[in-house]
């Protein structure tokens, strides 16, 4: 490829990456949708924001099989085409079941290409350029969350249908990927995958459980903040979108800081991540103003983005089965996300949590415990090294 072709290929891949983090962009629509569908239980309304995660993980399980049949590029194009249709369909949909179906399809489309983008980057770029492109991918994911959330938050002022115009970004992503990313031979990337999938890290089950717990309480924050702000009387659907926007900005900053902080702190970065998440939950729990909740959202994004790359790095370091281990972590992530509305309801009912503020105090307790546990583990390791 010429230099110009390389730039266009890289830009096209990164533009598709923008879509991967855009599903939660309509979280701020929850209060508006609850009014639009008064006969639908709130837990089902909240499921609209997390049902993409469930179908995303189903698609992740199928994506490698589909890629072997039709090729990597074609699989990505099919996935992006699905997001174009499913992302924009709610502009015209008035039926709640069809709206739920469109969100499920959107998640499925993202899942088809989400785990394949790293393979595509690894195929076209080597060495430092590969590392740099992977870093850009993380940044573009965060940028996508910021951009789509901001646009959706402004458009929801008109009506909830209009907010889905934010997904028009999927159209240029499809066109550019189709035009500027060369076709990839089927055999080569799949041979690498087969070699990488033979072993799993010994601690994989621990990583899966930890991921499930952290992402469950992280997602509870995302789905409950809009309802909290409206019910507490200090926010609207639009102001709630600023919190989701701040979360995306925090995630971008966390992603940019991760490499440098990890080099310095190693596994102690988890203490920083869980401390940030603790402070975020406290800020939201005590808040009676949009600005403080926005700060909570920003800290949530930083903490989450410091945690998740750590998990992916850990499973890639300990085993040769990078692809399989990464897929399992993504499945745990998305399963936790898709179940989070019902997990929140279960926690509220079983622990007799009467208010949403108290649910955030429970989140605080969970992240405090995790911070203390990993601080203790770090201290024990340091003590053993000193001996």
Where are these regions (language model features)?
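Helix-breaking motifs and short loop linkers at transmembrane-helix boundaries and internal kinks
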Residues: 39, 71, 89-98, 126, ...
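Conserved MFS/SLC helix-loop-helix module at the cytosolic interface between two early adjacent transmembrane helices
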Residues: 58-96
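Helix-to-loop junctions at the C-terminal end of transmembrane segments
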Residues: 59-72, 253-266, 348
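Paired small-residue
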Residues: 86, 97-106, 291-299
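Cytoplasmic helix-loop-helix junction between adjacent transmembrane helices
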Residues: 96, 102-141
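Helix-loop-helix hairpin linking two adjacent transmembrane segments in secondary transporters
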Residues: 127-128, 132-182
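Extracytoplasmic gate region of multi-pass secondary transporters
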Residues: 203-245, 252
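A late C-terminal transmembrane helix in Major Facilitator Superfamily
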Residues: 317-355, 363
